[in-house]
UniProtKB/Swiss-Prot annotation:
Gene3D superfamilies: P-loop containing nucleotide triphosphate hydrolases
Annotated keywords: ATP-binding, Cytoplasm, Helicase, Hydrolase, Nonsense-mediated mRNA decay, Nucleotide-binding, Nucleus, Ribosome biogenesis, RNA-binding, rRNA processing
Taxonomy of the source species: Eukaryota, Fungi, Dikarya, Ascomycota, Pezizomycotina
Record family assignment: Belongs to the DEAD box helicase family. DDX5/DBP2 subfamily.
A GO MF label: RNA helicase activity
A Pfam match: Helicase_C
The name this protein goes by in its record: ATP-dependent RNA helicase dbp2
SUPFAM superfamilies given in the database record: P-loop containing nucleoside triphosphate hydrolases (SSF52540)
Species this chain originates from: Neurospora crassa (strain ATCC 24698 / 74-OR23-1A / CBS 708.71 / DSM 1257 / FGSC 987)
Length: 562
């Protein structure tokens, strides 16, 4: 089948190199359904001009329940329950893996050693052996050429084990930290899967559906699938809330092989008849734990109910809590599982963790001292992500830093979508190497090369602490996490000390003393629920940053420090 993609007609995979205008324009560096992809007159004007274009807000303060502006109430009530007659469904191909002779000849002892050396654990029946090189994975030439062009030296651990699992057509669970290379672990087999299926006919929905918790993650996935699906002319679109529906609807009506979506907006499209999931035979749930954290479980269940039961399903998660296990048990069949690293709550050991016990009034001065050290020299490429406990503190700190000459911008749920996109782009490109964020706004953001995380306010629990500091030290790099810890946080001292000890980090004696006298922290998800306020209270300027470019992000830099 893979040779059957001629030009012409609806089914032909012609068109501009994998991807419609809705989503990230890699050449122009913009989101062309929201503003001009080359910074034109109706977008982010070049050279620092302001923004045009509206872009729907988040509704209801923050995420409207999660996932980039998706509304949560009564979603999916209009979807009809499907009764599948399996005998009437067209057959499809999902098993493509042919073991390379080098892999077949490896002894069980050699396989065990490779897995142990790379912290790979596998579970399930007849799990295929891992591959050690790209050539051993057995991808077709059109995929391998794209991979080699990227200059990767070897597959990551999750790719070594995950590719044979995914290509075999089995249902797969993969547990690995963000930044481990999991996106390519499911994207490349997805391309092979698509090229083995009949071409789309008018009215057909996608063949591959990828669900993600946030629009930021969805766009990042789209960038990968566009890059590697280019030679196959595979079309894709990104479907997420917080932006106009028109461009997304146009993409779906023209036909796309891949749909990357947040759950709420996808259900909206399904209920309004703009697409259907009858052709989906390859389903991916990315960051499943985050989707459940954000309250998407009912929507995920409704969406999966619209997809044929004999599909291939791949679920990816950074953690493996009971809720994720239940979802896997309900929707995956005889699945095989790969875990990378420990399943215990643990921090990435490549991250240097510095925890300083401070008073609330000391935080600003300490932050400036760290910034002076981190940002020393104009040539350095450091990027710093600063976490705060509330949106108001995020704006306060951003305002304070900009008035002190630091190129900081803030991102949180009260910002409109186009401002969030712009801030993220400024941070990614290094034009603004300091980004201040709240926990919710940061979910799903995968910015490479963040060198430092600074926890201005300590989060509500150890799991959030580990997720925060995990923004640095990705994909094999080293990172540094600096955390301000006050006596108000003392109930969490014992749990934090445990995380630091596990990662063999130095512990501030005052923190150790707090841990001895503080009592329990309420377990992994419980414990102290935060102060609510916190952070700098200095009375410069008004409230938050508002819904367009304004507030703290609009302040000019005074006497630029960097």
């Amino acid at each position: 089948m893979s040779g059957s993609y001629g030009g012409g007609g609806y089914g032909g995979r012609g068109g501009g190199g994998g991807g419609y205008s809705n989503g990230y324009d890699r050449n122009g560096g913009g989101y062309s359904n929201n503003y001009s992809s080359h910074g034109g007159s109706n977008g982010y004007g070049g050279g620092g001009g302001g923004y045009g274009g509206g872009g729907g807000g988040y509704g209801g303060g923050g995420y409207g329940g999660g996932g980039g502006g998706d509304r949560m109430s009564a979603l999916g009530a209009g979807l009809q329950k499907q009764n599948w007659d399996m005998s009437a469904l067209p057959k499809f191909e999902k098993s493509f893996y042919q073991e390379h002779p080098s892999v077949a000849n490896r002894s069980p002892a050699e396989v065990d050693k490779f897995r142990a050396d790379h912290s790979i654990a596998v579970f399930g029946n007849n799990v295929p052996k891992p591959v050690e090189t790209f050539d051993e994975a057995g991808f077709p030439r059109y995929v391998m050429d794209e991979v080699k062009a990227q200059g990767f030296p070897a597959p990551t651990a999750i790719q070594s084990q995950g590719w044979p699992m995914a290509l075999s057509g089995r249902d797969v669970v993969g547990i690995a930290e963000t930044g481990s290379g999991k996106t390519l672990t499911y994207c490349l087999p997805a391309i092979v899967h698509i090229n083995a299926q009949p071409l789309l006919a008018p009215g057909d929905g996608p063949i591959v559906l990828i669900l993600a918790p946030t629009r930021e993650l969805a766009v990042q996935i789209q960038q990968e699938i566009s890059k590697f699906g280019k030679s196959s002319r595979i079309r894709n679109t990104c479907v997420y809330g917080g932006v106009p529906k028109g461009p997304q609807i146009r993409d779906l009506s023209r036909g796309v092989e891949v749909c990357i979506a947040t759950p709420g907006r996808l259900i909206d499209m399904l209920e309004s008849g703009k697409t259907n999931l009858r052709r989906v035979t390859y389903l991916v749930l990315d960051e499943a734990d985050r989707m459940l954290d954000m309250g998407f479980e009912p929507q995920i269940r409704k969406i999966i109910g619209q997809i044929r039961p004999d599909r291939q399903t791949l679920m990816w998660s950074a953690t493996w809590p009971k809720e994720v296990r239940n979802l896997a048990a309900d929707f995956l069949t005889d699945f095989i599982q790969v875990n990378i690293g420990s399943m215990d709550l643990a921090a990435n050991h490549r991250i240097t963790q510095i925890v300083e016990v401070v008073s609330e009034s000391e935080k600003r001065d300490r932050m400036i001292k760290h910034l002076e050290k981190i940002m020393e020299g104009r040539e350095n490429q450091n990027k710093i992500l600063i976490f705060t406990g509330t949106k108001r503190v995020a704006d306060d700190i951003t305002r304070f830093l900009r008035q002190d000459g630091w190129p900081a911008l803030s991102i949180h749920g009260d910002k409109q979508q186009n401002e969030r996109d712009w801030v993220l782009d400024q941070f990614k490109t290094g034009k603004s190497p300091i980004m201040v964020a709240t926990d919710v706004a940061s979910r799903g953001i995968d910015v490479r090369n963040i060198t430092h995380v600074l926890n201005y306010d300590y989060p509500n629990n150890s799991e959030d602490y580990i997720h925060r500091i995990g923004r640095t030290g990705r994909a094999g790099a080293k990172g540094t996490a600096i955390t301000f810890f006050t006596t108000d946080n003392s109930k969490q001292a014992r749990e934090l000390v445990g995380v630091l000890q596990e990662a063999k980090q130095q512990i501030d004696p005052r923190l150790a003393e707090m841990a001895r006298y503080s009592g329990g922290g309420g377990g992994r998800f419980g414990g102290y629920r935060g102060r609510g306020g916190g952070g700098w209270r200095g009375g410069r300027g008004g409230g938050g940053g508002g819904g367009s470019v304004g507030g703290a992000n609009a302040l000019p830099l005074n006497n630029r420090r960097w």
